[in-house]
Amino acid sequence: MPNPVRHGNKKDSGGSASTMPESSGSVNNKDRQRISSKHKRHKSKHLRESSVPEPQTLSTLKLVEYDDISSDSDTFSDVPAKQERRENDERRPSEKSDKMHKSRHRHQHKRLKEATRTKQVEKERKPEKTQEVMVNKVPSSKDKIISSAKRTADEQEEHGRTSKSSSKDSRSKMHKDKSRREREMKSGHKERSKSHRKRDSSKRYKTSDSPKRKGRSPRRKYGGSPKQDDSHSEGSCGQDYDDSPSRVHASGNFNETYRKNMDSPSYKEPAAYQSSARSPSPYSRKQRSVSPYRRRSSSYERGSGSYSGRSPSPYVRRRSSSPFVSRRSLSRSPAPRKSAKSRSRSPLYPRKSSSSSRSKKQKSQSRSRHSSISPARLPLNSSLGAELSRKKKEIAAAAAAAGRESKGSPLILKKESGDSRVASALDLKKATKVLKLEKPVSEPEMVTATSSETKTISAKKEESEKKPQVQAKDPKISGLKDCKPAAIKEEVLTPKEGVTDRDKDVPPLPPILSPPPPLPTSPPSNIPPLPPLPPSPAVLQQPPPPLPPPPTLTFLPLPTTVAASLTSSHYVRQSSLSTQANSQLPVPSPAKPQPPLIHMVPHMKTSTLPPLPLPPLLLGEDDIESPKEIPPPKSVKKEKDKDRPRHLLTDLPLPPELPGGDPSPPDSPERKVVAPPQPPLKKRPKICCPRYGERKQTETDWGKRCVDKFDIIGIIGEGTYGQVYKAKDKDTGELVALKKVRLDNEKEGFPITAIREIKILRQLIHKSVVNMKEIVTDKQDALDFKKDKGAFYLVFEYMDHDLMGLLESGLVQFSEDHIKSFMKQLMEGLEYCHKKNFLHRDIKCSNILLNNSGQIKLADFGLARLYSSEESRPYTNKVITLWYRPPELLLGEERYTPAIDVWSCGCILGELFTKKPIFQANQELAQLELISRLCGSPCPAVWPDVIKLPYFNTMKPKKQYRRRLREEFSFVPTPALDLLDHMLTLDPSKRCTAEQTLQSDFLKDVDVCKMATPDLPHWQDCHELWSKKRRRQRQSGIVLEEPPAIKAPRKESVSVPGGDAMKNSSPAPTQPVKTESSVSDLAVLGDITQQLNQSELAVLLNLLQSQTDLSVSQISQLLNVQANPDMQLQLEALNQSITALTGAAVPPQEVEPPKETPTLDQVDPLGAGTQGEVQNVLAVLLSQLLKPQEVVDAPGESNGEQSGSNPTAHITLEEEEEPDKHHEQNEEEEEDAGNYWSP
């Protein structure tokens, strides 16, 4: 087993066997001194404050002896390890977190080892056991005998202590026998706690680098001398405990160093620890208890929030496990530890410790124990050591004789306690004198005083506790194991986790850890469990001694009330209290009187003063949880404890009430937890409600619909990550724009620009910002994306045109009112974006969309980003299309503002008046040159900060220009010119904002609703893609250039309703006048159109694009019109008029009726005769148009325009011709981008 080996290591380090106690001790002392020397440098100040360095040698020797004992106890603990392991396995889940914390507190492991060793030794040698228990600090029975002989000589000098101590020793022996029996009875619980401790300690030891640390760990943890507290212990241990269990884990190494420091003489333990080393046999026991005390501290810490691994607090786990026996064993519950301590060490000590924690005397004793513990390591004075040895010898003799005698009589115990008090006072005086002689340090003196007090008190308590504790322990054991109510009481005790341990060992820790008197307040929160556990031992101890009863009475009531209140409050404070306890555990080294170590300092001071130390012990215990109400509650608690100890044993069911109280707090938190979750659940839907509302508008959830829900009409644009299609929702008939997001070329998954656009558009809801309706995919199943990367489509409301397409088409002329309306809407949308802290960063004419009603919307937020006006941070300056890029970006500015968007809008304003971009360059330097020519050269005179820009010197214009903007735009109305001048200011800090533009004379009085709707080409959707294709066709010399020229006049003569009618699928009203066609033509066309529906017209339009010429007979055949002379004349007239208009000799002919599939065959040959490839494409398109028409009479859409399903729709020749030409253009565009169309 790893534990046995480690125990062996410990033994070796500590003086492996009792046979070699002193020599091993000396070696260990040397090692410790070496280790301490490392820390001495850093902690010299703390050493000065906390304790005298000289006594360290003595204390180290004693420590070595103690280590030997602990190693023996470790061997004992190995025997019950299996059972303990079983129990531990059950408790492992809770122990795991504790183990993390336990790594710090190896002293607990010592307890386990000592307990196990004591069991084995008890089996092997009961007499030796009694001797060893009497002399807990002595490494072996031989060492103990030798030390006892020396101590007897010293003790003879001391006043009646020897007789009292001898009686106490005999009693302690008797009590030890009883405690052994009790241990056997409680062995199950102890073994659990031991095994738990064992594993924890073993794990701790594993974490520790050396066995020496293991043996010393208990002392080291607490012994981390005040020096260590200030520097190392505070920093490491205090932080570890205070911070959290996580810290405890993280500081495993820290704990090791901390332990090393404690071992080293430089790390003198607080005076309390030191004094205990020299204290008589009871002190030696106390020292053992001290090590358990350290274990307590660890267990306490474990129990406390920092050891939340087992449970956020001892209360929680104990609550959870009504059998606190297991909890005790797991969490080092005070009762099992008491029994273990009493067994391995004299039961008097545990009793003393518990009684000391419960009574003022006990408090002082526990503090003195701490001091005595530290003296054990740090020999404050040879005189103190002699006194301690004397006391130990006297106590041993007295315990052997008087222990047996006094077991039966509480009066004797009381007397002994009174005598012990007197002796303690004398001892304190002596110790303080010796300390003063050795060193003037007030802390050591206090420690020695406290140690002497603890010695006398411990002796008294041992005597008083012998019978009551044995009896009480047995009932506790039986009650804890057998009775759940008893378990509940112990649970209350156990919640303190080692209340017994603390009383026995922890009381010393509290003095160091909990000097602050505020502990009483903290006890209410955390102590509630602690008082109950000590009360049981204290009850045993306290009832016998009449002297302590008054303080015990006062103390007991508090523990019960405090236990109740603390149990309830402890749950709330568990984590914080545990952290406090943990911090206090490191604070144990607070022998220093540093204010941060207030807890330690008060303890030291209180330990020097017998009455004061008593409250501090309770405070110490309480301090671990909270150091607020220390002194007054302690006395009350002592009295209550004295009364209740018996009552606690009998009133075990009452503690269950405390646990009940504890559960109630958890219940309340649970209720709270339940309540908060519900509100969040309610809140989350509220947050989502608006989005769900938007989705409800489309009656679909984003991403769940497939793109096949839309009929794709055509391609209208190309974006950075895909094409933009015009489509119609099959369910609603609504036109939409599908922006394709292709994933096949994306190495990083979804394009960041698309993600940005989606994220921003969902936050921007404005009438002047394009609305994204939903997102659809082209895969029905998400798994399809793995096989073949699919695509997403952003579904936007459809806008008929964009500003670039309209301006380049030449089909529209904007009046000043139109420009006002456009700019008003544009700047409203931009102001909205800027108020939302978004920069568009890509404003250009092609990203400004219009519909046929003249409504403007800002689109394409792929480059937009959130910006913070409060913090200036750099952004990329490679944004905004070059023609619309402001001068600051051209000069390398990275900390730009929304003014960049205003410049782009200024460029658009000038473009609306000039019908072309005002700055058209293909390079940044050329662009800056054009800007300089119009707006003046950037110079510090007009733009002070321009010299700070990165490219100011490298991109200076060749020539300095003056501002000529007003001259160049003199034709612009003055209000518009003023606005343009302001928007195109070089200095961005002087440039107007979007809000200011709306307040300008040009826009402030504009009412968009009252503005006249611009005459837009309803027959043609003017988008950037279409405009670019037209431009290429013009450059290539294709004749299709003419249709726009023809359309422009038509647009003027044709009323908007006609185009709208076609797009809205409503019958188009006949046009009364047409400039380029005769009335006779209109009449002829009217007659023909009456026989056609829109679907037929669509087929005809497609057909006409492949035909350069159609004879009347062909038209009559295609349209199934009887070739009577009148009709032939009409068709000829129509053909001639169209030929004249288009110059392409392509008469717009009506479409064949969809019912005639043969027309497809006829069309194909016709087309084949004229244009080979084009005709093939058109034939395919025609076939696709006719197939759906055959299925459904509803007409298809021509040129992306909705065609009405009304078969009797009447369309005038103009409408026919416009769609024809529009269709021709679209078809040619489709030829260029034929692959975009999916057959």
Swiss-Prot record:
Pfam families: Pkinase. GO terms for biological process: mRNA processing; positive regulation of transcription by RNA polymerase II; regulation of MAP kinase activity; RNA splicing. It catalyses: [DNA-directed RNA polymerase] + ATP = phospho-[DNA-directed RNA polymerase] + ADP + H(+); L-seryl-[protein] + ATP = O-phospho-L-seryl-[protein] + ADP + H(+); L-threonyl-[protein] + ATP = O-phospho-L-threonyl-[protein] + ADP + H(+). The keyword Protein biosynthesis does not apply. Keywords: ATP-binding, Kinase, mRNA processing, mRNA splicing, Nucleotide-binding, Nucleus, Serine/threonine-protein kinase, Transferase. Residues 81-100, 113-131, 140-172, 179-190, 202-212, 459-506, 636-649 have a biased composition (Basic and acidic residues). InterPro entries: CDK, Kinase-like_dom_sf, Prot_kinase_dom, Protein_kinase_ATP_BS, Ser/Thr_kinase_AS. The keyword Secreted does not apply. Residues 1-421, 437-557, 570-687, 1037-1074, 1146-1168, 1191-1239 are annotated as: Disordered. Residues 300-337, 345-357 have a biased composition (Low complexity). GO terms for molecular function: ATP binding; cyclin-dependent protein serine/threonine kinase activity; protein serine kinase activity; RNA polymerase II CTD heptapeptide repeat kinase activity. It is an enzyme of class 2 (transferase). ATP binds at residues 716-724, 739, 797-802, 1023. Residues 15-28, 273-284, 448-457, 570-586, 1063-1074, 1199-1209 have a biased composition (Polar residues). Its EC number is 2.7.11.22, 2.7.11.23. GO terms for cellular component: nuclear cyclin-dependent protein kinase holoenzyme complex; nuclear speck. Cyclin-dependent kinase that phosphorylates the C-terminal domain (CTD) of the large subunit of RNA polymerase II (POLR2A), thereby acting as a key regulator of transcription elongation. Regulates the expression of genes involved in DNA repair and is required for the maintenance of genomic stability. Preferentially phosphorylates 'Ser-5' in CTD repeats that are already phosphorylated at 'Ser-7', but can also phosphorylate 'Ser-2'. Required for RNA splicing, possibly by phosphorylating srsf1/sf2. Belongs to the protein kinase superfamily. CMGC Ser/Thr protein kinase family. CDC2/CDKX subfamily. PANTHER family: CELL DIVISION PROTEIN KINASE, CYCLIN-DEPENDENT KINASE 12. This is Cyclin-dependent kinase 12. The gene is cdk12.
